[in-house]
Amino acid sequence: MFFGSKMLLCLFQALHQLYYDPNIENKNLAQKWLMQAQVSPQAWHFSWLLLNMDKVPEIQYFGASALHIKISRYWNDIPADQYESLKSQLFTQITRFASGSKIVLTRLCVALASLALSMMPEAWPCAVADMVRMFQAEDSNVDGRARCLALLELLTVLPEEFQTSRLPQYRKGQVRSVLAQECGSVFPLLEQLLQQQDSPGFIKQKVLKCFSSWVQLEIPLMDCENLIQAAFTSLQDPELFDTAVEAVVNAISQPDAQRYVNTLLKLIPPVLGLQEQLRQAVQSGDMETSHGICRIAVALGENHSRALLDQVEHWQSFLALVNMIMFCTGIPGHYPVNETTSSLTLTFWYTLQDDILSFEPDKQAVYQQVYRPVYFQLVDVLLHKAQFPSDEEYGFWSSDEKEQFRIYRVDISDTLMYVYEMLGAELLSSLYDKLGRLLTNTEQPSTWQHTEALLYGFQSIAETIDVNYSDVVPGLIGLIPRISISNVQLADTVMFTIGALSEWLADHPVMINNVLPLVLQALGNPELSISSVSTLKKICRECKYDLPPYAANIVAVSQEVLMKQIHKTSQCMWLMQALGFLLSALQVEEILKNLHSLITPYIQQLEKLADETPNPSNKLAIIHILGLLSNLFTTLDISHHDDDHESTEVKKLPVQQGPNPVVVVLQQVFQLIQKVLSKWLNDAQVVESVCAIFEKSVKTLLDDFAPMVPQLCEMLGQMYSTIPQASAIDLTRQALKRKPDLFLCSNLDVKAVFQCGVLSLKFPEAPTVKASCGFFTELLPRCGEIAPVGQVVHENGKVLLQAVLEGIGGQASRSLMDHFAEILFALNKHCFSYLSIWIKEAMQQDGFPSARVSPEQKETFSQQILRERVNKRRVKEMVKEFTLLCRGLHGTEYTADY
């Protein structure tokens, strides 16, 4: 770029395009050109010209930004003898803009701040004190108030610029220390401005923002004491409230603050003094004020609970703070419509509990005596806050508000689960007693919301805590059928509570019939889709050996809802998984009979779809049916090899003899699946759905899968010959992992499969390449034990190595290097004698795998790989290092974190 009138004209045109041209392409071009201009050597010259007062603010802003970029990023380009001149010019410009455009003033202040950070402490030892002195000096041309605002802006951006600066780490520590000492020049000025009666609101607001900025430099809390007290006073001024809250919270929340316990203790009374203001705000519906005061109370309690708990003689004042936070937790109204404050407090209760439970036993017992009643009160408050509003009110909520409320309830659930650690079984007893009184009190009928909240509390705890030994669960199971369910939200919670107790039901099967009818009835309600289906799945998984008496009814109800298509796809898949668990515990004849009635309608539908011309509509239907079969076979496992249950007579039965029902079904539908596949071989989603059926079957069937091997091999060959798909390669890998003797199958062309795998390594899609790498890491360990594999690797291994090295050399994404490294590791471990020859021959090719690496670097890499046959992590590091060399990226900042 050249500098002169022509360049200035180009700058003005580009800026005009950037701000005013409606064409987005022109804007982008202008922005690109301007960014280059900002970093050019000429920027030192044109920046000052653009700051002329006759220019519009947009142009002036660009000039100020260019100065900041040059100072912050290209500091080393500035000769030391020009530092003072640059400093003086910036002071002059800031003084000129003190009464001008605020955005330009801020940018100039940021530029001077960057200059100060680069110069201090050697070249500018008292930078902050000098800034204060310069702006306090009388200047007849500039209004005193404007000068004050300019100084406050400069002092505010200085710590902010430090936080984002690119200073080296050793310099950062040095400069932080200097700035912390310089607060002695800043804080007295801020205190004076806050205390002056005639200081206008906007000046005080700027002072509080400046203080907020400085406390983040880890200034000792005792040095901030006067300003924190002044900020508390400012909370009474509505104009200053938000800024004062931010200042107090930032000061209290500094990690170093806990060292200054005496100062923290002094802060409790002013925080407690805000309670009346908080109550008035709640009564008048002033959400902003209640939110701000709550933030202050939580900041003090959450950040310093351990330090304050340790001050035993002040236990009453800390307990008062805890009760103030409890008030914030239970603030009236429904979150997030009437209040947004209560959610801020939840992490405080975690922190307080952790700190109490971390004390040694004797001390902990004392604190438990004080705080257990507080936590029981907290449970009541949280369950009240978790209650749904009236149906009428809830109907007016937006979908976003409903989603926020759902997340809020999840947070409450997590808190209740955590509180159980402190309150133990007594908490469950308390919830059970309240629910019992609620359901049996005929004189005062309760709202469904109250019942739902108590059940929600039970569910929250039972989902994660082992309640199998609780003496209240039998009573709860007995109470559930007495609940009058007239509402979707209540019904959902009843379902989820039953699901959470499924493990308990497995140990107490006599109680299953108390709740199973409720679950089956709920299955027919689309509004209860997720809760009813997930609960049935849990019951079928945990209690399957006790469900044969109910199996016919469960299958019939499930089949009916599946045929009615009232559930979404994912719930249909869960339902099939539930039926798979259920059928696994039946006799083979019963399984086959149920399978026939269950899947025949889908097979008939699939036959019809297989005859149709492929289109988007029938594609979705095909994928849905294949998904149903796949999910059924995922959990239908008659081998019981994964079951830990051995207590009942049913579970002691030997593994059933005869054909595996899944194999019987697969053999019956195989031709149909092949027919579907023949029309959809080029569609990755359909191929993936087909592969999923067999992949999940292989996992559960193990040796029983043997009868399917010839047909599966033929189908895989058909897929490979058309187009290698990631899902097909994954299926092959899974099959090889479970049954490596698949390679002994006479129908299998191992060489063709191997070559398809090599071809797939060169595909642009990462999932395909990952799957191919996984295939080879399963295949190569078999080359010593399975002759056909060994022969193919011996004859074609060099081609595989060539493809791997090409990928490492730059043909594949760097994110895939770990996967390529695993192939190299497997080759070295299982084919060492071949690899040492192949890698030498491959590396002798000129420019291979990259023209950027020298023969010496290639030789070093080869020797490193051949030496490492134990540590896979080291091989991955070698490959990452070598690929950077191949790509010309080694040692660049671009790859610093690679």
Model-predicted regions and their roles:
Residues F2-Y898:
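Karyopherin-beta/Importin-beta family HEAT-repeat alpha-solenoid scaffold
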